[in-house]
Amino acid sequence: MKEIGNRESGIVDGQRNGASVGSDPTALPIPHSPLPIPGAHARPPRIALIAGEASGDILGAGLIEQLRLRYPNAEFVGIGGDAMRGVGCQTWFDASELAVMGLTEVLRHLPRLLKLRSAFRERVLAWKPDVFIGIDAPDFNLPVERWLKQRGIKTVHYVSPSVWAWREKRAEKIGVSADLVLCLFPMEPPIYARHGVDARFVGHPMADDIAYQADRAAARATLGLSASSTVLAVLPGSRHGEISRLGDTFFQAAWLVSEHLPNLHVLVPAANPGCKQLLAEQLSRSSLPVMRSHLLDGQARTAMLAADVVLLASGTATLEAMLVKRPMVVGYKVAPLTYRIVKLLGLLKVNRYALPNILANDDLAPELMQDDCAPERLCVALLDWFKHPDKVAALQPRYLALHAQLRRDASARAADAVAGLLEGRDSEVGIWDSAGAKA
């Protein structure tokens, strides 16, 4: 899920332990006591975690920090990266060992991954943790959670799979594996409640980290752009397959926009060196002026902050664009066979794809999918934002309301829920409202 917790100096700030961030006077206070929660442990709590990718590593670090406020002598072990190690987690394996993507790569590494999973669960069982927390990575974590739960260890799954979008019955299987599910979005706990699974809405860490009023001027200064520049950010995805399907289409759309806005600057953040090479090849094939096309190393949030409008692939980046309050156009394509199968079997249960639209239950951003994701149609949608600042202004309060809904001091709420499980409190199944309270 995913640049959760990404910080770019001078551009974003955060909120911890109830400190106010941003300038929205209607924002709800988030009081959380840093005092340890009393418990009856004969020894300090032992907490094992697995984070299988960079975003999970950052989530895990925030959770560990908050749990340590409640249990200063707690011990933390597991699979993680630099962020989790930085807050005192002893990692038996590095998170990079789980970072495989795509069916072919997964199949190639499957024997190693199965061996690693078996070794980890035997070692963690011998360590006798009080709770195990699997962070995202459901294909790896849920079997570990189920195996440990069968042996009497309390289990938590942090970051729900998208049960609201497709295969809702997965909620039942997740409940077999996890005693508690920690959800980033408010529409998720009611789905789990229908299946008898305890799930809590804790908020989204990205909403905690991004200021209510983001600073466009600072972002433009960081990138060497003037305040008067006309700027489009283009983000065709963070994976090779996404970029291969969307990049040329997006850059052709950007060129069409530049025909109407001759001084347009185009910002293209690359998630990693492999993506950068592919994006550079696509840019070289496009008709975009070299002097006004800026290929960046990372800096996706800075690029979105600096932009007037954002063109991006459907995914977590749409949430980030909403949180920095930028109008966007969302495009996406999947392999034609995959699309036909999904449509034929009716696997998708939502009629919107972009997270801001799903959260608002409204069409805040144009969505152009599959055959509709064509340069000409993308150009029309982008120009509509550039040429109608009144529409952009009307969008801001909608974005702000969604931001406030998600901004709940997620790490602290997640730690409270884990502490409740450890202490045997709030263990009954229930529906949890958008503020994270029992309905």
From Swiss-Prot:
EC no.? 2.4.1.182
An example molecular function term from Gene Ontology annotations: lipid-A-disaccharide synthase activity
Q: SUPFAM superfamilies, alphabetically?
A: UDP-Glycosyltransferase/glycogen phosphorylase
GO biological process per UniProt: lipid A biosynthetic process
Alphabetically sorted, this entry's keywords are:
Glycosyltransferase, Lipid A biosynthesis, Lipid biosynthesis, Lipid metabolism, Transferase
Reaction(s) catalysed by this chain, per the record, are: a lipid X + a UDP-2-N,3-O-bis[(3R)-3-hydroxyacyl]-alpha-D-glucosamine = a lipid A disaccharide + UDP + H(+)
Pathway-wise, it operates in: Bacterial outer membrane biogenesis; LPS lipid A biosynthesis
Database matches in CDD domains? Glycosyltransferase_GTB-type
Among the Pfam families in the record, one is: LpxB
Stretch list, region Disordered? 1-35
Q: What are the GO cellular component annotations? A: membrane
Would the keyword Transferase be found if you checked this record's keyword annotation? yes
UniProt lists the family membership as follows: Belongs to the LpxB family.
Q: Which NCBIfam families match?
A: lpxB (TIGR00215)
Functionally, this protein is described as follows: Condensation of UDP-2,3-diacylglucosamine and 2,3-diacylglucosamine-1-phosphate to form lipid A disaccharide, a precursor of lipid A, a phosphorylated glycolipid that anchors the lipopolysaccharide to the outer membrane of the cell.
Specify the protein name: Lipid-A-disaccharide synthase
